[in-house]
């Protein structure tokens, strides 16, 4: 049956364009989903998931895009081989999946892997030595499984590890593999079969906020420094990629079996026969065209609907475009001055002046400010796995983000000569950028380290000035600001010094504003840093202003003694801690033994002993007996040179 040429051309042109558009769109989507994924990662992932037992839980439909699967997260990386960008597997999160397999040695092929979370399964056998090839690994969470055997001896080569949880398994051997993991923040090896002594090096891990060695009956001796800590980690939250929404493809099925009859008494066709045949052909062509166009239109509509549906879900789950920057200082004239924080290449070119649990601190020149230098602190805020988000979770996260912005807004408007001013805040889905004034002298911890190494001098008048400045800043936060702000992590690393050696307390208000950020607190909402935490916190888990006073007392002791709580010196004393050693020396026949030898015989011994007594007063075990920040500032101000 022929279709009239004119009509066919009229209808087929838009049809051909629609088909071509659909095919181009399909090929584009396919290239995004497949062509940019690193082939070696794909092969490794296939083996890893098979041996873990993940594949048995997955339908064939989920194999379309490995980076869109539940638990598999990828990031763009530049390939040195091809010179192009590829997707690399950076996180594998298979918690609570009832897995009963093993970790494949192929895990070592994932050279960009930053997180491996397999908690709460029934996985068995040993942790393969091949995991040592994952040099980028930062999070290893294997708790609540049935792993056995010993941890590989060269485990310390995973120097980037921040979170290590091996608890509730059947692992054995000694703990020497922990010796050089100096970037650890959260550590738990509880409820295993480990034996031997706990490595003394752990006390020098400055980033360590939390550790748990309990439940290992064969371990010998106490835990270093803070042997009473018995905390439990909570699941480490990770970044996510929203799962693909299935595309629907409705089709239309027109009824083309209709017939017509001539009215009774109507004339016979005669000369109208050819016209009727042409009319019939047009109707058939229209029916066929309608069927094809309807089918293709339905398919395209279904595809578009699925994309829109996905975008709506992302918006509901808090993945909407982040708000613009909050600016708190006239130094930053417009939001565009902070646009470089959205540029990965621009950030990569900045000088890194510090690294910690929260991420990195960059030194940058503020655009349009005639050379004004700023410090940009990146605070990691990993979002929850999209597959685990419920509607209630989404509402909670949205409320939480509003609360974070509100808290930071409060901090941004605080101004005091002994508090480091926050200039701006830029929020991103997975991190926060906090912009501060740049302090060229660095932190008190940096200076004390240089002094101890003999590279710098810090005489007593300068130390007293620093102590008085910290006390004044605390007094403002505790007594003068409404609402009261408790620092929660006061330590030398959070005290910066300006050009006049005036103390500036940093990071105040952040521990409350961002409790899930991996900054100065653990994921179980435990605040502070080992060596500076008030003893009552381990019983009450409540942080008060008297906890800040305790931390300040430790800093006063450091300024006089010249040693940090993590110094090996205290490990060779009977007291095993700075505070206990300080108390015993100050009540001994010769309290001057507590004074830093670099400060002796300069005529300030009496003043330093007075400050040491104030330090003991601030670190009393009973928080009710400790002074408040105003009393401390008053006592220090009465000590004259």
Swiss-Prot record:
Catalyzed reaction equations: L-seryl-[protein] + ATP = O-phospho-L-seryl-[protein] + ADP + H(+); L-threonyl-[protein] + ATP = O-phospho-L-threonyl-[protein] + ADP + H(+); L-tyrosyl-[protein] + ATP = O-phospho-L-tyrosyl-[protein] + ADP + H(+)
Alphabetized UniProt keyword annotations: ATP-binding, Cell membrane, Glycoprotein, Kinase, Leucine-rich repeat, Membrane, Nucleotide-binding, Plant defense, Receptor, Repeat, Serine/threonine-protein kinase, Signal, Transferase, Transmembrane, Transmembrane helix, Tyrosine-protein kinase
InterPro entries found in the cross-reference section: Kinase-like_dom_sf, Leu-rich_rpt, LRR_dom_sf, Plant_LRR-RLKs, Prot_kinase_dom, Ser/Thr_kinase_AS
Record-level GO cellular component terms: peroxisome; plasma membrane
Cytoplasmic topology ranges: 306-641
Principal location class: membrane
Tissue specificity remark: Mostly present in leaves and flowers, with increasing expression in older flowers.
Knockout mutant characteristics: Suppresses BIR1 (bir1-1) disruption phenotype. When associated with AGD5/NEV disruption, premature shedding of floral organs and enlarge abscission zones.
Impact noted for substituting residue 557 to R: In sobir1-5; suppresses BIR1 (bir1-1) disruption phenotype
Intervals holding LRR repeats: 112-133, 136-159, 160-182, 183-205, 207-228
Region span, Disordered: 243-278
Glycosylation sites: 154, 186, 256
TM annotation in the entry: 285-305
Topology feature Extracellular, residues: 32-284
Effect of residue 377 to E: Loss of kinase activity
Outcome recorded upon mutating residue 455 to D: In sobir1-10; suppresses BIR1 (bir1-1) disruption phenotype
Consequence recorded when altering residue 626 to K: In sobir1-6; suppresses BIR1 (bir1-1) disruption phenotype
SMART domains: S_TKc
Effect seen on changing residue 407 to K: In evr-2; loss of kinase activity
GO molecular function: ATP binding; protein serine kinase activity; protein serine/threonine kinase activity; protein tyrosine kinase activity; transmembrane receptor protein tyrosine kinase activity
Pfam family, any one: LRR_1
Task of the protein: Dual specificity kinase acting on both serine/threonine- and tyrosine-containing substrates. Acting as a counterplayer of BIR1, promotes the activation of plant defense and cell death. Component of the RLP23-SOBIR1-BAK1 complex that mediates NLP-triggered immunity. Functions as an inhibitor/regulator of abscission, probably by regulating membrane trafficking during abscission.
Quaternary structure annotation from Swiss-Prot or TrEMBL: Interacts with CST. Interacts with RLP23. Component of a trimeric complex composed of RLP23, SOBIR1 and BAK1. BAK1 is recruited into a pre-formed RLP23-SOBIR1 complex in a ligand-dependent manner.
Protein name per the record: Leucine-rich repeat receptor-like serine/threonine/tyrosine-protein kinase SOBIR1
Species, as recorded: Arabidopsis thaliana (Mouse-ear cress)
Name of encoding gene: SOBIR1
């Amino acid at each position: 049956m022929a279709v009239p040429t004119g009509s066919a051309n009229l209808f087929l042109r838009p049809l051909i364009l629609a088909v071509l558009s659909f095919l181009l769109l399909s090929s584009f989507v396919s290239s995004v989903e497949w062509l940019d994924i690193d082939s070696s990662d794909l092969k490794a992932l296939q083996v890893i998931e098979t041996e873990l037992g993940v594949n048995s839980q997955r339908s064939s439909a989920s194999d379309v895009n490995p980076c869109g699967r539940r638990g598999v997260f990828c990031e763009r990386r530049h390939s040195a081989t091809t010179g192009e960008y590829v997707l690399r597997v950076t996180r594998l999160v298979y918690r609570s999946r009832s897995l009963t397999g093993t970790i494949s040695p192929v895990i070592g092929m994932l050279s960009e892997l930053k997180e491996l979370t397999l908690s709460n399964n029934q996985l068995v056998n040993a942790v393969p030595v091949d995991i040592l090839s994952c040099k980028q690994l930062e999070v290893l969470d294997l708790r609540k499984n049935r792993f056995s055997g010993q941890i590989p001896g060269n485990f310390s080569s995973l120097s980037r590890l921040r979170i290590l949880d091996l608890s509730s398994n059947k692992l054995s051997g000694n703990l020497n593999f922990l010796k050089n993991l100096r970037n650890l923040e959260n550590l738990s090896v509880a409820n295993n079969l480990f034996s031997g002594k706990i490595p003394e090096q752990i006390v020098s891990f400055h980033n360590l906020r939390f550790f748990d060695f309990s439940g290992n009956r064969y371990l010998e001796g106490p835990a270093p420094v803070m042997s009473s800590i018995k905390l439990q980690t909570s699941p480490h939250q990770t970044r996510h990629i929203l799962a693909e929404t299935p595309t629907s493809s409705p089709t239309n099925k027109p009824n083309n079996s209709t017939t017509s009859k001539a009215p009774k008494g109507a004339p016979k066709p005669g000369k109208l026969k050819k016209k009727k045949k042409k009319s019939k052909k047009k109707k058939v062509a229209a029916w066929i065209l309608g069927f094809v166009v309807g089918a293709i239109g339905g398919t395209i509509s279904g595809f578009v609907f699925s994309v829109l549906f996905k975008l709506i879900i992302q918006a509901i789950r808090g993945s909407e475009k982040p708000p613009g920057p909050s600016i708190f200082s006239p130094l930053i004239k417009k939001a565009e001055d902070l646009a470089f924080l959205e540029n990965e290449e621009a950030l990569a070119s900045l000088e890194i002046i510090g690294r910690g649990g929260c991420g990195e601190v960059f030194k940058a020149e503020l655009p349009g400010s005639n050379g004004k230098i700023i410090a940009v602190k990146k605070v990691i805020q990993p979002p929850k796995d999209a597959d685990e988000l419920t509607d209630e979770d989404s509402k909670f996260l949205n409320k939480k983000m509003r609360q974070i912005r509100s808290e930071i807004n409060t901090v941004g408007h605080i101004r005091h000569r002994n508090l480091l001013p926050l200039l701006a805040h830029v929020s991103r889905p997975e991190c926060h950028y906090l912009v501060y004034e740049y302090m060229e002298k660095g932190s008190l911890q940096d200076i004390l380290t240089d002094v101890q190494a003999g590279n710098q001098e810090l005489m007593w008048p300068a130390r007293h000035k620093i102590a008085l400045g910290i006390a004044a800043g605390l007094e403002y936060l505790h007594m003068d600001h409404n609402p009261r702000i408790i620092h929660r992590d006061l330590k030398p690393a959070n005290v910066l010094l300006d050009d006049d050696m005036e103390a500036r307390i940093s990071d105040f208000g952040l521990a409350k504003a961002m409790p899930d950020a991996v900054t100065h607190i653990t994921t179980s909402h435990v605040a502070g840093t080992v060596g500076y935490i008030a003893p009552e916190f381990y019983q009450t888990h409540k942080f008060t202003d008297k906890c800040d006073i305790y931390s300040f007392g430790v800093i006063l002791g450091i300024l006089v003694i010249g040693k940090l709580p993590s110094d090996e010196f205290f490990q060779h004393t009977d007291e095993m801690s700075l505070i206990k050693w300080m108390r015993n020396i100050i009540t001994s026949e010769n309290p001057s033994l507590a004074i830093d030898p670099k400060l002796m015989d300069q005529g300030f011994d009496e003043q330093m002993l007075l400050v040491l007594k104030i330090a003991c007063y601030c670190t009393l075990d009973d928080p009710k007996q400790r002074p408040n920040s105003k009393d401390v500032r008053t006592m220090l101000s009465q000590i004259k040179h």
